[in-house]
Amino acid sequence: VLNLAELDRGPEAAAQFRESLRAATHDVGFFYLTGHGVPADLEGRLLAAARAFFALPEASKLAIENTKSAQFRGYTRVGGERTQGEIDWREQIDVGPERPVITDPAAADFWRLEGPNLWPEDLPELQSVLAEWHELLSGIALRLLGAWAESLGAPADAFAPAFAPDPSTLIKVV
């Protein structure tokens, strides 16, 4: 368990956080982050919007099926994905940051994943709460990435060319 707020509690606490982060990522491979500042009301609104989305009629969800998105965004029905050949028994919606489609044929293939999301017409609050979630969590991720770089002996902005200022993220609501 790592407390991100330790970065704000002085040089010694920040150094200890970075060392704990390095150990967790190097020796364990995962960690649970606390002290991130995500408001409980935002978590609640996100969970409520997710429940409301999955309670929509099938036709409403299929109207934004990810097969209609060149960026693989939108709804995936139960059994619509497989892992190692086995059906994944879940439904989900995938969203990313709202950005223009990259049309440059010389751009790397991964840039084709940038673009618009598909949103359900009958649940507009899903878009606003996920945009708020994305904005907040992207900032937390960039802060954590800077601490991780420092934990490895690099400058805090070592990963910035790859991830900042606008990280390419994917939110999967399951």
How would you name each of these model-derived features?
Residues 1-174:
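Peripheral, non-catalytic segments flanking oxidoreductase cores
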